[in-house]
UniProtKB/Swiss-Prot annotation:
Pfam family, one: Anticodon_2
Example of a GO cellular component annotation carried by this entry: cytosol
Chain ranges for the short sequence motif 'HIGH' region as given in the UniProt record: 11-21
Natural source organism: Campylobacter jejuni subsp. jejuni serotype O:2 (strain ATCC 700819 / NCTC 11168)
Motif ('KMSKS' region): 240-244
Database matches in PROSITE patterns: AA_TRNA_LIGASE_I (PS00178)
Signal peptide residues on this chain, from the entry's feature table: none
Catalytic activities: tRNA(Glu) + L-glutamate + ATP = L-glutamyl-tRNA(Glu) + AMP + diphosphate
Predominant location: cytoplasm
Stated name of the protein: Glutamate--tRNA ligase 2
Assembly and binders: Monomer.
């Protein structure tokens, strides 16, 4: 029987979800969806001292915001300690693992000798075949009997064949600490095997864990999954992405007014491509994504590309979706009359959702203040008189075309040019010299509101 392709994302809730983690989750999600498989979410919360409930909540919220739906319930490792203990006991009973009674002082002494001899620090296996009486007062750790020679070889979906010499990297590593808690590599193997994970896509910072995990898969008699190790995301300076390159927490992007569609599109392209295409919907990606086409080299974070993609999605997504995202930021466009027209007014220039919010407020609400720099630059006695005449002549215009035709006729009669009038109108209506097409703003506000705002501006500035 052909097994169902199953991937997983397994973050540790010791901090908020980083965009590198979201990219890993996205790759796993897309590969599962393309193949009709399962995408699982596992929270690796065995570090009870460092775990944060807020971080766990933020991870799940980020998934919801991005529309990455996992299959089944979330698995929490902290609820599976009894299961891990069963498998530690199994390996002990089969002679594949053993208790090690080395004290902390003995370990430090061994490490100091190895460093003095310029040897790689490693456990020397002194309790590997121990059958004597255990020393008093020592709570033992449990170590796996790892191979001491030969090679560990696997075919990585991104990097190709990867080889590790056992003697160079391996010692009898710990699978259970002295307090009985299992170690990271041990829990990962147990869970991936029992959850039916067939394919593991993860950052290449996990590459060094892979030979240890393969040793455990073989010792436990589990099938080894297919591994794909993805190069890290770098900043534009070529260094590992960090806070100094900008936001790294996924939910910070939401607060910045970035759409999830734009962020996912941006992240998938950091390491994967499909021809020269730049824009992909999530539905497109479910059909096209192939982890075997992930680049081997690190990808470079490009803030301008994210901004460009965000502007694209603001221009093209339907009103309902844009407004749903705006509501998450505490702003509901639908409460305004002609809300769809207002969005269309604003979306052509907008780079973030905050541009929509600020633009809507500046148009819908009559200005309380006027940009002084804009006034000094664009307003003078002559065009104040022109503006007054313009307002007095407005009558029954309704569409942007009506306002444009009327304005052109008005300027021709006054022997003036659009540049003499456009910015004063813009400032009078919105308080700023920056706005969408002035004729569309006139249409949105209507003749009565336009006259009212121009009159108010003239009262304030005409003193």
């Amino acid at each position: 029987m052909h097994e169902k392709l199953t991937t997983r994302f397994a973050p540790s809730p010791t901090g908020y979800l980083h965009i590198g983690g979201l990219r890993t989750a996205l790759y796993n999600y897309l590969y599962a969806r393309k193949n009709g498989g399962n995408f699982l979410l596992r929270i690796e919360d065995t570090d009870l001292k460092r775990n944060s409930k807020e971080a766990t909540k933020a991870i799940i919220e980020a998934f919801k915001w991005c529309g990455l739906e996992h299959d089944g319930e979330v698995t929490y490792q902290s609820e599976r300690f009894d299961l891990y203990k069963e498998y530690v006991k199994k390996l002990l009973d089969e002679g594949k693992a053993y208790y090690c009674y080395m004290s902390k002082e003995e370990l430090e002494e061994l490490r100091a000798k190895q460093e003095a001899a310029k040897e790689r620090p490693r456990y020397d296996g002194r309790y590997r075949e121990f059958t004597g009486t255990p020393p008093q007062g020592i709570e033992p750790v449990v170590r796996i009997k790892a191979p001491q020679s030969g090679e560990i070889v696997f075919e990585d979906g991104v990097k190709g064949e990867v080889r590790f010499k056992a003697e160079d990297i391996m010692d009898d590593f710990i699978i259970a600490r002295s307090d009985g808690t299992p170690t990271y590599n041990f829990t990962v193997v147990i869970d991936d095997a029992l959850m039916g994970v067939s394919d593991v896509i993860r950052g290449d910072d996990h590459l060094s864990n892979t030979p240890k995990q393969i040793v455990l898969y073989e010792a436990l008699g589990f099938k080894i999954p297919k591994f794909f190790h993805v190069a890290m995301i770098h900043g534009e300076d070529g260094k590992k992405l960090s806070k100094r390159h900008g936001a790294t927490d996924v939910m910070e992007y939401k607060e910045m007014g970035i759409l999830p569609q734009a962020l996912l599109n941006f992240l998938v392209r950091l390491g994967w491509s499909h021809g020269d295409d730049e824009v992909f919907s999530l539905e497109d990606l479910k059909k096209l994504f192939d982890p075997y086409h992930i680049n081997k080299s690190a990808s470079c974070y490009n803030a301008k590309k994210l901004e460009w993609l965000n502007a694209h999605y603001i221009k093209t997504l339907p009103f309902e979706e844009i407004n749903r995202q705006l509501k998450d930021l505490g702003f509901d466009l639908s409460v305004y009359e002609k809300a769809g027209f207002l969005l269309d007014l604003l979306r052509e220039r907008a780079k973030t959702l905050h541009d929509i919010i600020n633009g809507a407020k500046s148009i819908v609400n009559a200005p309380q203040n006027y940009d002084e720099n804009a006034v000094q630059k664009f307003v003078n006695k002559n065009n104040l008189e022109l503006l007054q005449a313009f307002a007095n002549t407005l009558k029954d215009q309704k569409t942007g075309k009506d306002f444009e035709d009327f304005t052109n006729d008005f300027l021709e009669k006054k022997e003036a040019k659009l540049k003499d009038l456009a910015q004063p109108i813009r400032i009078a209506l919105t308080g700023s010299a920056v706005s969408p097409s002035i004729f569309e703003v006139l249409e949105f506000l209507g003749v009565d509101e336009c006259k009212k705002r121009i009159d108010n501006f003239l009262k304030v500035r005409g003193k």
